[in-house]
Amino acid sequence: MVTLNRGFVGLTGRLEVTGNLPEDLRGAPLLLASNHISNLDPMTLVAASRRIDLAPRFVLAGGLLRVPVVGRVLRSSGHLGVDRESANATAAMTDIVAALHAGVPIVIYPEGKISLDPGLWPERGKTGLARIALGSGAHVVPVSQWGAHEACYWGNLKVTGWRDLLPYLTSWLRSVRRRPALKVHFGDPVDLSDLRDGRPGDARRAHERIMRAITAGLVPLRAGEPDVPAFHDPTRPTTGSSPWRPTA
């Protein structure tokens, strides 16, 4: 699967990876917190992680793991699912913490979905990752991505037939011709040492630090595109405004 993913990403665009992981964190409980800009950015993140000798697992919406064929592949690859509103959410969190302490790097998207901010800056997100970090003692490495949005349209809310797949296929084929830069930056670990699990307000404070670190790493990746992406995706709805958007 790793070889197939690397080949797919290499066909899709030009992978550019910056930053690295401190050697003393290898094998330690590690959370990778990334912005979410495209249906393809998980594949880009996997390929980038292999460049720095990491093999992370993703925390995904539980429904994905129940999709025929796709779900089986994801489960066999070690990815984890969580249904936030279901009774198994606590058990899923236990599995995540166990994987972290077994030395498995875990990727979580704090936003929980592809950003719909008009400028494609990170959305507000939720505190789940921050709570896991504080509760498990895991280190948090912010990951910033840019360019994968040019490789695949946002597409449709639901796919009920082959016509619904056309936006994904046509945008990807254009990407193969255009070869956009697929940029991934691994930032410095976020310092959460003064915060405590269960202390009122600390999960929110941790979340804010993580999101600001992701955004800080994103700024140089999208130099020349500070307001809105130069690439226009006609299928992506835009709502709200990112609270993390740089003001200067």
Regions picked out by a protein language model, each given a short descriptive name:
Residues 24-86:
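Catalytic core of membrane glycerolipid acyltransferases/transacylases, capturing the structured
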Residues 13, 63, 86-90, 122-123:
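A conditional alpha-helix N-cap/helix-loop micro-motif detector
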Residues 90-248:
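Non-catalytic C-terminal accessory region of glycerolipid acyltransferases
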Residues 4-36:
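Helix-to-loop junction immediately C-terminal to a conserved catalytic motif
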Residues 5, 76-83, 112-116:
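Short, basic, glycine/proline-bearing loop/turn elements
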Residues 13, 54-56, 77, 104, ...:
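A structural micro-motif
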Residues 4-8, 73, 162:
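Hydrophobic alpha-helical segments of integral membrane proteins
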